[in-house]
A protein has these predicted regions:
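Conserved catalytic-core motifs of GNAT/GCN5-like acyltransferases
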Residues: 68-71, 129-131, 141, 146-162
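Helix-loop element at the rim of GNAT/NAT acetyltransferase active sites that forms part
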Residues: 13, 24-37
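A short beta-loop-alpha structural element at the N-terminal edge
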Residues: 8-21
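Conserved beta-hairpin
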Residues: 50-64
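Conserved acyl-donor/pantetheine-binding loop and adjacent beta-alpha core of acyl/acetyltransferases
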Residues: 60-98, 104, 154-159
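Conserved acetyl-CoA-binding loop-helix of GNAT-fold acetyltransferases
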Residues: 99, 105-118
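Conserved GNAT acetyl-CoA-binding A-motif
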Residues: 113, 119-133
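Short loop/turn motifs at secondary-structure junctions and domain boundaries
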Residues: 43-47
Length: 175
């Protein structure tokens, strides 16, 4: 059944009506580091261009969301509350990439990441930045992210690692 779902998955920008589903995904896939419903609502309202969902048969089953900034230091936890979000910032910062457990393992997170990377390029961002746990470093390396080192963030009581994906545009340089 899972394999058949992937054919029916549509990746699209978030809509206000997706809030409850996105909060369910966030709270199911994350523990003490999960964003609150209010934070997700704020991300949807402030930066829908940086928020994609995966939908199968009318159900939102996965998401990726972000904010934009001119800062290189993304360890300030207030940023996840969109405190320093700048729509036209040079960097886009991934906050969450999550797929409901029943739909994991069939390429949905890959489709979300591929579309997110394409959308970030279209927005002319210089880099995608993120923090991840140790177990996800190899996942992001598959997308050509570079490892920047251990983060000073201790969000949720976890050890985090910083990674980034620089973009090179047609003019031969970065944007």
């Amino acid at each position: 059944m899972k394999q058949g779902i992937i054919k029916n998955v549509k990746i699209r920008h978030v809509a206000a009506g997706d809030l409850d589903a996105c909060f369910t995904i966030e709270s199911t896939c994350y523990t003490t580091d999960a964003a609150t419903r209010e934070k997700i609502e704020k991300r949807i309202a402030i930066f829908p261009a940086g928020f994609l969902v995966a939908e199968a048969n009318g159900q939102v089953i996965g998401m990726i969301n972000s904010g934009a900034t001119n800062k290189d230091d993304i360890t300030d936890d207030a940023f996840k509350d969109m405190a320093d979000h700048i729509h036209d910032g040079k960097h886009i910062v991934i906050f969450s990439l999550a797929v409901l457990p029943a739909f994991q393992g069939v390429g949905i997170s890959r489709r979300l990441m591929d579309m997110f990377i394409e959308a970030s390029r279209d927005l002319k961002k210089e880099k995608i930045l993120l923090m991840c746990k140790s177990g996800l470093i190899s996942y992001y390396l598959k997308y050509d992210f570079l490892y920047a080192g251990k983060s000073k963030s201790t969000l949720g009581g976890f050890e985090w690692h910083e990674m980034y994906l620089p973009f090179v545009f047609d003019n031969g340089g970065q944007s």
